[in-house]
Amino acid sequence: MSFTAAFAQSPVDSKTTRLHQRILTLDTHADAPTMLQKEGFDVGITHDTKRDNSQIDFPRMKQGGMDAMFFAVYLPQGQRTPEGHAEAKRNALNQFRLIHEALKKYPDAAELATSPADAYRIEKAGKRAIFIGIENGYPIGEDLSMVKAYYDLGCRYVTLSHFANNAICDSSTDPDGPLHNGLSAFGRQVVAEMNRLGIMIDISHTSDKTFYDVLALTKTPVIASHSNCRALCDFPRNMTDDMIRAVAKNGGVIQVNFVSDYLRKPSEEYRQALTKMRMANVGRVSSPEQAARQQARTDSVKQVYRNERASLADIVNHIDHIVKIAGIDHVGIGSDFDGGGGVNGLEDVSEIANLTAALKSRGYSDKAITKIWGGNLLRVMSKQQPAK
C-alpha cells in the first residue's frame, strides 16, 4: 500500500503509520452512492470535502489507507404502496448500476468484493475492495425474490429499516411509533432468506423490539453497520448496553459511526431541527434528485449548529464503551461518510489514520486495532452460510 504526501503530513507517528499500512482497514458504511448519483461526480478523481461535501473517492481511499468499504445503496423511506416500492426498486437498481460502472471504469483502482477472501486478495493487489450493502429494506418491498436479486448484484448486508417503518419491520425513529411490534410476518421471511443466502442482517436503525426479534430468529451473527452507544448518547437510534451484550452473545459486531449527533448528545433545538428535516420525505416517493435536495437541506441545518460537532475522541469513547461491555471481538468501524459522518479531526476518508493513532494513544494493542479495523467484521462475514 502506498501513501501520498498528504497522508505523511498527518499527525501520525512512523510506528503507527507502519501499523496502519500493515493491517486491513474496512469501513462497513459509506454513502458514496449518494455522490455517484450527482451529475458529473467522478469517484476516480480527488475531491475537496469543503468544496463539494464529498468525503470518499478512490484516490482519497488510497491516500488515507482505507482498504475496503461497503458502499451503501441508500433508499429514503417512502410510501408503503406498490408505487412506492417500485420507485425504491428502480432507485436501488440505478445505484447498483452506478457502483458497477465506476468499478468497470477504474479497474486498476478498485474492485468488487463479496467475501473476506476477496478483500484480502484485492488489498494485496494494491486496490480498494468495494463491498455493497443496502441501507433500508424498502426496495425489497413485499417481494421476497428481490433479496436474491440484490444478492446476485453483490449485496452482502441489508439494513432492515431506516428512519421510518417499512414492510419488514419497525424503525427506532418513526414518529408514529411501531407498526408491526417488531418484525412483520414478511420480515421474518426476509430474515430467513438472508440467512439462506449468506447476507448479513444489519440491525442499525431498527427498533429495540425488531432487534430482539431478529436475534431470536437468525441462525447467523448479525451486524450493526453504523451504530453507537445509548449510554453515552441517549437516542433511540443508538444501542443500549443490554443490546450490545446481546450482539456479543450472538457473535456479531457493532460498527461505530462518525455522526456527531449519535456520538455526543446535541441540544434539543438541534435534535428537533434535524429530525424535522429527516422526516420531511417519509411517506413520499423520492427520486435521486429529490433525495439530493433533502440532503442539502439537512446539511444546511448541520452548518447552523456546527459548533455542536463531535471529535475524534468521542468516536474512541464509544469504542471503549463497547469493548468494556462486550469485549474487543465485537466492535468495528462504520463511518457513515457521505451520509452525515465526519468529526473534528476526521473529516474524510483520507484522514482515517488519525483514528488508528487515537486508538494507539488510548492503549489499544496492534492486535486489538487489527480486529477493530476489519478483523471482527470479516470474522462475522465468514460465519454467514451462503446457499449452495
Sequence positions of predicted segments:
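Bacterial Sec-dependent N-terminal signal peptides
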Residues: 1-11
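Alpha-helix-loop-beta-strand connector modules within alpha/beta enzyme cores
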Residues: 179-195, 214-224
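Substrate-binding cleft of carbohydrate-active enzyme catalytic domains
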Residues: 189-203, 207-210, 241-249, 321
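Charged catalytic cores and adjacent phosphate/nucleic-acid-binding surfaces used
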Residues: 220, 229-230
